[in-house]
């Protein structure tokens, strides 16, 4: 869970293991792991390097890219955080073979949003993708395209003052219905 208690346990593990300002934290998991791990790295010893290895579709196309890190606090989602981009994001789409339907479609919905805000070709490819009979080679290409859409927007607006707000489309309503 993205809580202060979990964050403290990550800091404690880093400290106990003798991590220094030159250490590297590897975040392997879904969006909760990349958000919390990124924030732990951004704040431990005033910032250590970290890489994200996302294992869910949503984490691949959203949470692990763009540098928004944080935890939930006082009942509010992502209330405490920092803009701290990962040193690297390693995407291995083989992890997607392990996803259940719910987790697949939560990531696919994010990809559809990227298609809406990018170009008609990407949008058409996403609409033509057969989610009932997943072609993982095609999905790998679509993931790469969605990541590029997000990276292009983040590069233009790293601190979410303008165009990057388009990436929040749907998040405001969804935050009220999704679990912490």
Each predicted region: which residue ranges?
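ATP/NTP phosphate-donor binding region
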Residues: 1-24
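Oxyanion-binding "anion nests"
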Residues: 134-175
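Conserved small/polar residues in nucleotide/adenosyl-binding loops
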Residues: 176-180
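Glycine-rich beta-strand-to-loop/alpha-helix junction loops that act as flexible
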Residues: 28-30, 170
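Short glycine/serine/threonine-rich phosphate/pyrophosphate-binding segments
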Residues: 32-38
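Structural motif
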Residues: 27-28, 53
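A glycine/threonine-rich phosphate-anchoring loop and its flanking beta-alpha core
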Residues: 38-129
